[in-house]
Amino acid sequence: MSVPVQIATVADHVAGDVFTAAMWTSLEDNINQGIVEQVGVMVKRTTNQAVASASTVTLSFDTDVQDVYGMWALASPTQLVAPVGGWYDVGVQVTWAATSGGGGPFEVRFVQNGTVQVIASTGIQSDGTHATQQQHSCKLYCSVGDVITITVLQRTGGTLNVTGATATLVRV
């Protein structure tokens, strides 16, 4: 999926060109746009998503919180797409339903173009009354059109719901 993005560039000029007021205004606008309209997306999941024990499940998002450059689409709810090349901060916050089972830590995996790049884990609240929350982030270098997905894994012995999740992909 290709997303057209206009990033400010230095205009072509030759030695001796006069820097006009219009050129100054254009440069100022491009700089301000680059600061204010940072390339990034934030999406969230507002309903439960079931995760069977010992199964890797790709998080699916249902709400666009902020998406300046069309990096997420409801038609492909699991995918965050890099519109321009560069370094990105990928972040996720996942809330799991309370469980009284054990089974080891919950895992979050950051996946780039189908390949797992980072695995992060969090110990679980196993008292049966408190939810487990995970918050992880990493830096990934993306080319134009790279697809980032986030998967989760739990090993409690039964199906457990992700009760909420928020993900971000922001160019740094």
Task: Annotate each PLM feature.
Residues 2-172:
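Extracellular jelly-roll beta-sandwich "head" domains, especially the C-terminal globular C1q domain
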